[in-house]
Design a protein with these regions (language model features):
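N-terminal small/glycine-rich loop or linker at the start of catalytic domains
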Residues: 3, 8-14, 19-56, 117-137, ...
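Terminal or standalone catalytic/regulatory effector modules within metabolic enzymes
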Residues: 48-49, 79-91
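Helix-rich catalytic cores of soluble enzyme domains
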Residues: 56-66, 70-73, 86-318
């Protein structure tokens, strides 16, 4: 569908915890219906992911899920979302990603049945389609592995399916380094948008076929967040990064035009624009999150979020 009008009529309605189109998913969790829930991101410590270490990998995720759920119950959280961002090797071998998805789902189910903790599991396969140069986005082994990763993770119990897609990034990256706004606009507004339309038609179709899974959303992490980080390092002008940040909203909107319903990805800082246009719930992060991108914009980011998240934290004892 194309959006011809704003779903949110004014700033007084663009508030945290409420969306015109709430999303119900997982274990009795409704996002955007009056409460902001934590979304917890996590990852492995430095560890090779291979057959020889797979038992250790699984044990880390068992610990992560057990600890997060136990803390959520102890704090009497009204609900929680876990996000499992597959590492590249887990998308390369789709069965591995699905196995971890099943582990996390089992812990959430147990907490819901034992303590009534409402929850959902977001699963985000890695977009591995840019392995070749130029990348093969719609055919080839990488796409088949990515497609199978989505399918198996849905089957294993993923509630919200998302991705950080990379179509058009090879043109956009060069545009950033040369300060070429025409290349940036072409990468974001033409190449990325076309890839998003194609990709999200398929993600939404797989979610619909899988029953209870919902198509969450995409993020311009590989585009606008790259610009933001380079600007923080004084490698390109902050004004250019700000323009790219605003431009990225048009790209991420394409997912919602092709079946996404939210909640959007936390690292999609363009989320407030998406929420205002679509009315779908969004996940955000900012300076007051335990771990997040360096940014002075945390209060703005949290002003209209429906999930409050963090950048992935390694499973290490501090």
């Amino acid at each position: 569908m194309a959006y011809a009008a704003m779903a949110v009529s004014g700033p007084q309605e663009l508030v945290f915890g409420r969306s015109p189109k709430p999303v119900r998913c997982g274990f009795d969790l409704t996002i955007g219906a009056g409460a902001v829930f934590p979304e917890v991101n996590f990852t492995l410590p430095p560890l090779a992911i291979e057959a020889a270490t797979w038992d250790a990998v699984k044990e880390h995720y068992e610990q992560i899920a057990s600890n997060v759920v136990r803390r959520a119950v102890a704090l009497r959280a009204p609900g929680v979302v876990l996000e499992f961002e597959l590492l590249p090797a887990m998308t390369e071998t789709p069965e591995w990603g699905a196995e971890i998805t099943a582990i996390l789902r089992r812990h959430l189910r147990h907490a819901y049945e034992k303590s009534g903790l409402r929850s959902a599991l977001r699963v985000t396969p890695t977009d591995i389609r840019d392995q070749g140069k130029p990348p093969e986005l719609r055919t080839g082994a990488a796409w088949e592995k990515l497609r199978r990763s989505f399918a198996l993770c849905i089957e294993a119990g993923g509630d919200i399916l998302s991705i950080e897609s990379v179509g058009g990034k090879e043109v956009h990256d060069q545009g950033l380094m040369y300060g070429d706004v025409r290349s940036i606009a072409f990468g974001l507004g033409v190449l990325a948008a076309r890839d998003m339309a194609w990709l999200w038609d398929r993600i939404a179709e797989m979610c619909a076929a899988g029953g209870d899974a919902v198509a969450g959303g995409d993020t311009a992490c590989g585009f606008a967040n790259t610009a933001m980080q380079l600007a923080h390092q004084k490698m390109l002008p902050e004004t250019l990064a700000a323009v790219v940040r605003a431009m990225s909203a048009a790209r991420s909107l394409v997912a919602f035009e092709h079946g996404a319903v939210g909640p959007s990805k936390d690292c999609a800082y363009e989320g407030p624009v998406i929420k205002a246009i679509t009315g779908c719930p969004i996940s955000m992060e900012g300076k007051s999150a335990t771990c997040a991108h360096f940014s002075p914009m945390g209060n703005i980011a949290s002003a209209m979020c429906d999930l409050w998240s963090n950048e992935s934290v390694q499973n290490v004892r501090l």
